C-alpha cells in the first residue's frame, strides 16, 4: 500500500512538471481515470472492511487532482471516475466480505501497476 501511495506521488509530480494545455486530452488520461476509479473503490471498500484510514483514499485522489490540475471536461471525467468506483461498490457491498477483500487486493495491485507504468512512461 505504501508503494502505491509513493507511486501516486511520483506520478503526480511528473505530471505537474509536464507542459501541456489544460483541457487538451493527455495521452495518459485513460490511465489516470482508471487510477481515480480505483481510488474511489478503495475509499469505499477499505472503509467497510475496517481499515480505519479515514479519508486517506479520498485525499490521495485530491492530491492527484491537485497535482494534475485538470480543468473543464478533464476534471469532470477524473472526478466522475472516482465517484463511479465508490458508488459501484457501495451498491454491491454493505459489509466486508471475502470478495470485498479480494477486490481490495486486486485494486491495490492494479493501482500500483498503473502508477509504475505511468512513471516509467512519462518520467523522462
Residue ranges and their predicted role:
Residues 13-14, 50, 69:
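Glycine-centered secondary-structure boundary/capping sites
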Residues 1-4:
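Positively charged n-region of N-terminal signal peptides that target proteins for export
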Residues 17-21:
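Sec/Tat signal peptide C-region and signal peptidase I cleavage site
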Amino acid at each position: 500500500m505504501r508503494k502505491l501511495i509513493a507511486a501516486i506521488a511520483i506520478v503526480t509530480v511528473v505530471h505537474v512538471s509536464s507542459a501541456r494545455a489544460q483541457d487538451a486530452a493527455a495521452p495518459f488520461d485513460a490511465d489516470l481515470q482508471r487510477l481515480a476509479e480505483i481510488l474511489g473503490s478503495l475509499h469505499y471498500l477499505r472503509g467497510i472492511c475496517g481499515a480505519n484510514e479515514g479519508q486517506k483514499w479520498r485525499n490521495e485522489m485530491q492530491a492527484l487532482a491537485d497535482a494534475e490540475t485538470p480543468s473543464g471536461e478533464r476534471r469532470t471525467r477524473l472526478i466522475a471516475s472516482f465517484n463511479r468506483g465508490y458508488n459501484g461498490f457501495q451498491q454491491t457491498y454493505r459489509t466486508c466480505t471475502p470478495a470485498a477483500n479480494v477486490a481490495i487486493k486486486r485494486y491495490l495491485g492494479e493501482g500500483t501497476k498503473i502508477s509504475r507504468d505511468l512513471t516509467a512512461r512519462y518520467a523522462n
